[in-house]
Amino acid sequence: MALMSNKTAIESILGNFEKKHVDAIYNAAAQTILSHSEFRNKHFAYSLNSYQKKIASKVGIELYPNGYLPHSHPLSKIFENHLLFDVLPGVVNTSRLVMCSIKESKVLVFKGIRDKSRRQVSDLNALNSLNNSHTSFINRLVASKDVSRYTEEADAFFQSKKGSPELFSRNFIKSLENKEAVFFHDEVHHWTKAQMFSFLKSTKVKRFIFTVVYPPEILKKFANSQNPKVYDFKVDKGRLFFFPDGVKTEAYEQKLNMEWLFSASHLRSGDCVWTVTRHKSIYAHHLFEISIGELVTDSKLFFSDYNSIDMSKIFLDRFRSYEVFPISIEHLYKVYSYLLCLKKPDLESGLAKLRQIIGDDVEIKEFLFFEQFCKRLIERQTSWGLFGHSFFEKLTDMALSSLPNSIARIFPQWKKKNTFEFLFSLGTLVVDVERKVCFEHVLEEWGFEVVITDENAYLDPLSIFAINENFNEDRVDDGYLERIRLPFWNLNDYDLKRKRVNAYNILSYRFEEERKIESAQKGPNKMLQIEWYGIKEFKVDPFISNSITEFTLLEALLGKRIDPKKYSYSKQACTLSNYLTFLCAEGLDGFNLEEHLERRLKAAGHDVSDDEEEELTSAEQAGPIKILADPLGFMKECLEEIPIETEPSLEERGQFSTDYHSEKFEINYNDIFNPHNCMNTHGDEIPTPSDGNCFFSAFTETFEVERPDTLRSDFSDWLMEFNGGSYASLAEMIRPNGVFMEAELIYLFCVFRGVTLIIHDRTHEKENVYAVHRGFEEGHMVHRGNHFVGIETYNISTLTSDPLLGDIPCGFSEEITKFHFRPDHFNCAQFRGRKAAFITKVDADYGHNGMVYPHNSWVPSLEEIIQICGQGDDFNCALINFYEANSSLGFHRDNERVYNDDPILTVCTFGEGRFTIEFKDQVTSFLMTAGSFFLMPKGFQKKARHSVSNEMSRVSITFRKHVRRLNGSPIAIREENYKNTCLINAFSKAMKRSKQAIIAKLKTVNSPFWSRYLSEGNGGSIEDCQSACEALDVTVDLNVNGKCVVLGKGALRISMALRNNHFSVINAAQLMERTFVSHLLEKGNVNVLEGFDAMLSGDVGAAGVNKIQFAANFEFARILANSFLNMTTGICLGKALDNGEKYFLHILKDRVKQIGIDVTMVCGFAGSGKSRKLQSWLHSRKKGNFCVVSPRTNLAADWAFKLELEPNEQRKVSTFEKFIKTDKSKLDLIVIDELTLFPNGYLDLLVYELADVNRHCQIILLFDPLQARYHNKMDESILTFEHDVDRLIGGQNIEYIYSTHRMSRYFNRFFDVPCFNQADRTEEQRLWIFDDVYSIPSICSDRQEPCDVLLVESDLEKKAFSPIINVMTFGESQGLTFNHVCILLSESSAASNEFRWMVALTRARTRFSLCSTFLGGIEEFKVKRKESLITSILQGEKITFNRLNLMLKCNLIRREKENGCRDEVDREERLEGDPFLKPFIFLGQRVEKDEDEVEEVKIREPTCQTHLYITEPNFGLCYNFDFIREKEQREYREDMLVTNQFCDSYDKVHINGKRETPGPLRFKAIYPKHSADDDMTFWMAVRKRLVFREEEENYQRLSRAHLVGGLLYTNFKKKMGLEFTFDQGLLEESINAFEKKKLEKSCGTIKSHSIRSDIDWALNDVFLFMKSQLCTKYEKQFVDAKAGQTLACFQHLILVQFAPWCRYLETQIRNQLPEEIYIHSNKNFDDLNAWVKKFFQRDICVESDYEAFDASQDEYILSFEIHLMKDAHFPQKIIDAYIDLKCKLGCKLGHFSIMRFTGEFCTFLFNTLANMAFTMCRYEWRRGQPIAFAGDDMCALNNLAVCHDFDDLFELISLKAKVERTETPMFCGWRLTPYGIVKEPELVYNRFQVAIEEGKVLECLENYAIEVSYAYSLSERLYEVLKSERQVQYHQAVVRFIVTHIDKLKTKVRDLFLEQSSDEDI
């Protein structure tokens, strides 16, 4: 986080350059600024406030630094100068410029700028020619102020005719006539539109450039300024009064209506057209240009120089403008977000926040608005949101929207909805103006009614929302202002009725004009002046369509593309009538109207014969009259005459685009060979003969041509007549057969045919695609060298009018064919006619119809294909299909649950196939060839199905985005969202590697396992820790419940603990018994059994592991074998069809009746992780000989996915039938998963086979004995013997894992099993019970928890409810996992056994619900079930472990797994009162460090008694009488201010206080007291302790100080012997220590300081105040008034950012300091006492004190700190932020110089370091010489010699030391002696007396007793220290006082004073 500023890469590296290089870099900038300074000083040096500076800089104006020129409206003046002198010279590129309405002085400045700029880019000859610049100026008198502005020459152009409508005199027009460029300054806003046209037509200037002043918000009907600090205005009766900078006395009056100018893209008068260009807009100042000709210009203008909310969202009354005070959007967002952050928001907090934001810019209207806004927000909140509505809420919303607001506002839902819509639709004000052609002959009026808002708009803003239609723009106001029956008046209006009337008025006006024309034949051509730009606004309104001449509208729509000789007016009118009737009948909107009309006209029209010419003429003459007389009848007549479906002839198609208008045709070279992005799919090239006619042959293959043999001659004939025969020469040239077609001829041919030709140029290796002409039909051909060939082209055409399927993105790229994929590259699934490989780069799986695809890792080439297609890069999975020839895939939808309705990309890399799409009842197909692709967009799968058929082999890739796994669990969880990763965190800290690096390594070893581990967020077990050890190659000593388990086998050994479900790192394992887990097996070893038993039996895997001897029964095996052969069990081992007998040869012969075998069982609760450790073990031993046998295909696929088996290793996972067929002779291990689902006798059958082929194979059985046993209707009467599981566990004690990773805490209300799933569920969430199955999907969906499956007991129920919801039987669901299941309570389930119910109750992760269809209801169901699991749940009883144990014939021994999944939330709770600090404190799991306590041996020194003399009573008062002076003499006075530091009375009464002395002689009067209300003391502190300087000077001084700072640090580092290496662990500990320290405060304290966390508190702004204190230092006794101590309060973010780094630095330095260097902190007096005893040398000591120590820590000390930080490996961004903070720091008093502040982060550390650096330079210090440091205090216990090596340095730095050499040194208020430290007894005595006066003895007794104890413990040796009688007196008095209050002491110091006998005892 950048604290003060963000730096670019170059700015960041500048700090590493040498000073000369930095100076050289900045020298260029200095020269540039110098070159600009003279000009900027004259025109941009006006004095601006900070806001105005910000505004000017934001719009890109270069200001003169520190402007000083006063001006009445400086900002507007700067805007004007910027347009004139910065922008205008770049716009005018001609020297022939005439400037008008501008002072001569400004013209001269403008000419100077232009001459200077041209001089820089011209040579000498050009320079000479510039001397003849033709820039001139002409002024005329228009306004009264012009008389004083311009010279008397302007009078010559004054229009003196009274009442003349012309604004310009003849002389003036003549002087500007035919000029190349004319510029008007700030005059055009006085003109009308008519005057603008008059000027343009009269002068005929080529370029008319002008500035205008006009507030853009008027265009959006705002009647007052939305930038009141920049400008203001007032609207009054069609006049606009503009106030620059809001200054009313400088007002300008001008015309209100300038809408015609801003909304005009072109000006048109007859055949003359001008283009309007807006060059620049700066708030209300604009620069426009009008140039001759019809050029491309902006279709819209945008004005966004606003920071207020768009109040038009509120005031939606039609046809009115409102006076609205601008409400800052920034203020609104900040107040709104602040209130949301508060747990208990209140009105006062919101308004206080607003007051803090706006500072001194208080506006009462804004306060009134926010007062009501905050009230409404607090009272009603904004519960109405975007998502999560129930069906009922949606209905309520629709009803409220349709009600009048007067009724709707009664409902509380409306008010919440209203607030939400206001906030949701809120945006910054942007004025956008739609531009169109402005006609001269169309008169304009602009409706503008101002509605002055009253106080209600601010007292109750929501009532204004109510009046203004609740933002529902579909509702129409019935009232509107008087219509102005003139065209182009507000054509696009809110009101539909008014819009129709306006449109009708325009048409009526045009028809009246048409009737005046004498020649009716010219009528339609004349009507072309209407043009499409006006007609298109009518939107084909039926109101208009019945009132307009149809063929006239058609011509206006299609422009000049209609050939009147080809299409009769009757046909045109009929075509239009038919289509308009169709539009009205269907209720369509007329989208792409002109294209549809062209297509229909093309179908209806035909060549005009000689006989028809008469009809044509008569129609031309009578048509308009007839149609106007009876338009509907004429339409009907035309409709009967000509069928609209008539297909056009060849000639009609070929000549459709012929232009017969008077305008001359010119070849548009911009329309020839334009680069084109072809999105069609192409097949093979179509060869053409190389006979010179290849173009025509290819054209014939591309387009349907009826007479291809005459194509060349028809084209030649057309050229002869086209454009008046101007292309006759080309016609003769192209007529001969074999003449090659070239560029212009190809273009003309496309014009002739009216087509668009797409040419694929494949002459070179890279294909280029070009488009020629824009016609009605598109075709493709290939150009290779000088030869044209055809090409097969396929386009996914529009299926229906449905917009979803209208245009499916598709394309083709040759690069795709370069990618080659083969089935043997991947682990494929086999289907009929195809193989498919599923590839993913996330933890995803995929399957359908009961099968699961094998897993393949992502390959980089797929990313390249995605990039080539360019259809998005959000795909994370791909399915590669390898189709065989003549294969197909039927109609289907890609709508599996693993993904949402996201786009799906299909790419064909090899071969070709036909893709068919079925939508509703329509079917369309297209061919996909190699290199083609298309995208099925979002929503496609819901509306359409698709199929594929292939005649030849083909490779297709389908890219998708998977969001969840097949079981419903989410995937693609972002790393920062991982939960319960204390195991990962522990490895990260122990190995000193980042968490990301640990995760990356784990995923490379076993991606499925660790991806699922992180996604589920259920924490880690001991087995997971072991897997991590093997993956990371480390050895972990894991401390678990007092035992130490050794995991892994690696060179690196670390110690961890698992306590309270939390993994943490410990320094070293304690001495305890260790259990070693075998690591005999290296990764990759083929012997899968080596170390396996040790893994199972060790402490890591012991939970749930049982060793049991199983007695296999031959009879049971034989029965099952016969059942397989008879196909009553299984389907693929039949005797007849499958030759199954060969697999049971070992059973057919006689065998012993029983065989005993030792098996290993792992038993555990559902989701307990029974298979997890085995999967981890086998994953690293995939080369071993093992096989996992699963009862179902989907379970087997899950094993294969987690083991990441290669294609040739798939045999290692098998279903139970396939496993019977496999060879078992080489297997070392067989894992049977979910044994309860295997048929009875399967284990017997397997044991007898192994007895023959492999006696050494080990069998592992995984099952939950509480789950249902195998059941099959076909063999239930055959396999009647007891199931293998029950025979195994019968009468045994079974270790059972009683915990679950599957189920959430929701299930703890039903079971007492520990649930490790961290889903957001609680036990309190109620059980849902539904009354019928039909309501389950809708209710669950509304509750945001859709039901995944309905579990039923019988197949009959499954069939009945399958159409409604996904249904499974209890048995089918066994082994599967869902998020939410619903269990059906019915007659069938009431008869089900407890094991099957256990299956149903344990299938869900987050919730199960119930649905009752039982006849009689829930109560009868409970009676039927009696005592059962489901009955307990219905009665609210928790199912206990003991209750489950009773279900079995064995004894389950409960074992719970330790799991690390504890997250801490106490930090968040502690920060509840400071929401702004919360984001900056780590709220996750803390690093818990256990440190071994080392008990130190304490040496007890001998104590001896001493005699203390009894002092005289009140002896202290005698001394005070001599030393205390009058208060008047001690206080400081300046002018009328005087300090108040010394008390001389008992003016303040203290509880329990005593008055033992007169007021002037009070002990409190000994010391100066600083109070916050003492202004003079504060100003003394400011003068003494603070230095102010501008930040620029601070930076300059710092840049010059680095040499001295470097010397200081180099010397310091050398003498201290410091060497730094970065320690990440120490940094994390420092961060944690800081946060813990911060949060040790109470919640109340944190909340009371929350204002310091306010995000709006500027980081470089401190709150400065004076510390209130009684200065009870020994040296402050009896002194005069002293300056106060200033404190600086910093923003909390500063502390959060820097404090941990300072802790880190302090620890690093302390660890390296020699023991003779002591830093005293944290009031640890024992350490100081021990250090003094050890190093005191009875020598002369050196003490140093500093003058203004804080203020003296200037840029040199800062440079020293920077060098230290860099050497300590601080990040550069931290150093840069620290520099910025020190240089930019300020408060309300101004900017500070670089200095230290009390209250700054780590003030003590940096003070101490500065003190040490100074001392090391000042004195000749050698190793072994003891020195104590503490902030600005220093005491050396040797007589150090002064060093003169740095004398020059000391002349530069501000630090000045006061040195004292003494034999009785003082340090931090302690006297240092050979026997330790002693506190000055006089100081303690006086403090006690002050406490007695104020009644605070008990508050300080303990601390003072501790201070005195050091002297008291010296006994008789004290007399060597206290050498004066006065000191002994004070000491005796203090000790006696403590002894008399000894019963009040609580700490161990009490024992010291009790050991001594009193005088009375002797």
Curated annotation (Swiss-Prot):
Pfam families for the chain: 2OG-FeII_Oxy, Peptidase_C23, RdRP_2, Viral_helicase1, Vmethyltransf
EC number(s) per entry: 2.1.1.-, 1.14.11.-, 3.4.22.-, 2.7.7.48
Obligatory cofactor(s): Fe(2+)
Catalytic activity: RNA(n) + a ribonucleoside 5'-triphosphate = RNA(n+1) + diphosphate; ATP + H2O = ADP + phosphate + H(+)
Binding note for cofactor: Binds 1 Fe(2+) ion per subunit.
Positions of the RdRp catalytic domain: 1739-1846
Binding-site positions, ATP: G1164, F1165, A1166, G1167, S1168, G1169, K1170, S1171
Protein name: RNA replication polyprotein
Domain OTU: 683-794
Domain (+)RNA virus helicase ATP-binding: 1122-1297
Annotated source species: Citrus leaf blotch virus (isolate Nagami kumquat/France/SRA-153/1984)
Function: RNA replication polyprotein: RNA-directed RNA polymerase involved in viral RNA replication. Protease: Thiol protease that cleaves the polyprotein.
Domain Peptidase C23: 978-1067
Modifications after synthesis and translation: Specific enzymatic cleavages by the viral protease yield mature proteins.
